[in-house]
UniProtKB/Swiss-Prot annotation:
Record bears the keyword DNA-binding: no
Keywords assigned: Ubl conjugation pathway
Keyword Transferase: no
Record-linked PROSITE patterns: BTB
Annotated GO biological process: protein ubiquitination
Protein name: BTB/POZ domain-containing protein At1g01640
Transmembrane segments: none
Length: 207
């Protein structure tokens, strides 16, 4: 067994303690009517300052079963989040990434947010880029937002022609302005590179 394999096996014991509920001391409840998930205070507190504050609150201390509730997450999403806290690996299905990304922002789990962000950036397409741009604006994630806008600028016709874009514009006028400005900057830069600066007779196409 290599050193890397030994290390993985050693750290895997923490995941086993979660899955087998070894000496758990707090219940984490999802937002829906579903069973709570037993876990360990030490892991929650170590991974998130927000969780640490929740566990230190009088409400949690006086609860007969010592529990905290994460109302934003379903039972399956909560399980994926907790498994990530123990393992550092995200094995959740794609349809959970949005909720986990927002939960990572809300509960200050920066590594989970980074993992979700990288996944979104890697999966950007003309079909999902508007949804991802809207998502990035919720926690004001400039990295994800810039990546989405850059993708839109490079694939402008594919993104803005479908009817979906009209709905997006109505719902997000400020983001639409940012897209237009980014497209203008890109068009001017390309014109300059080709020695044809924009003038009154040469205008970029704006949808």
């Amino acid at each position: 067994m290599t050193e890397a394999e030994q290390k993985a096996a050693f750290l895997g014991g923490l995941v086993v303690s979660f899955k087998e509920q070894m000496h758990t001391d707090v219940l984490v409840k999802p937002g829906e009517e579903a069973p709570p998930i037993p876990t360990h205070k030490a892991v929650l507190a170590a991974r998130s300052k927000v969780f640490r504050n929740m566990l230190d609150s009088d409400e949690c201390k006086t609860s007969p079963e010592e529990s905290i509730t994460l109302p934003d997450l379903s039972h399956d999403e909560l399980k994926s989040l907790l498994e990530f806290l123990y393992s550092g690996n995200l094995k959740a299905p794609y349809n959970q990434y949005r909720s986990l990304y927002l939960a990572a922002d809300k509960y200050d789990i920066s590594y989970l947010q980074d993992v979700c962000r990288n996944h979104f950036i890697a999966s950007l397409s003309s079909r999902n880029v508007l949804d991802i741009l809207e998502l990035a604006s919720i926690p004001c994630d400039t990295i994800l937002k810039d990546a989405a806008i850059n993708h839109i600028v490079k694939h402008m016709e594919e993104v803005v022609v479908p009817m979906k874009y009209e709905t997006f514009v109505q719902r997000n006028p400020d983001l639409s302005v940012e897209i237009t400005r980014a497209y203008l900057r890109e068009t001017k830069a390309k014109a300059k590179d080709h020695g044809a600066p924009l003038n009154g007779n040469t205008r970029p196409r704006i949808w």
